[in-house]
Amino acid sequence: GTSSNANALGISAGTGIPPKKIGKIYGIIKAYTSRVGEGKFPTELFNNVGEKIREQGHEYGTVTGRPRRVGWIDLFNIKYTIMINGIDKIIVTLLDALEGINPIKMCTSYELDGKILESWPIHYEIIENCKPIYKSFEGWEAIPREQWTQIAQEGYGALPETMKTYVQTIKDELKTDYFALSIGPDRKETILMNSGEVW
């Protein structure tokens, strides 16, 4: 769980597998951001959009049932995470949880005192004074669950065009290739972006 060491080095610590025996590192991110507990969260949503994402993404504590904090995807934060973990490819999950939301936003950088930051702040406390810089995207309509399953079976080309634009922009901003996209909770609702790789 996220209470353990969730970075790439935690793989060795948690499994006993030597670092040199680890092959590729895949980073798993949600199509939005969620967080448990206190802490700085520049893209947090406090409105009905946040509530809709929370409901559609089932963002409630597994044990406590408490609502998790949710917000727009924070690519500025994710870029830093990719760098420090040496991530090779990414997997984006819960794209279906953004259905029926328009517009959809993504944070690409932070602004501090009128200046756009080029890299992640050295001091964590600085984030509290940062303002997220957003790109806005046209959303996609709500789709019945069985249709999401059919889309996954047909592959990437069957995704709504607006979702493909959102997904492509994430890739371009992060400068990282995809391993897979998830548009539902079932394994068969996962789209592998390179069928030659083992899932």
Question: What does each model-found stretch correspond to?
Answer:
Residues 1-199:
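Non-transmembrane, aqueous-exposed alpha-helical and coiled segments at domain scale
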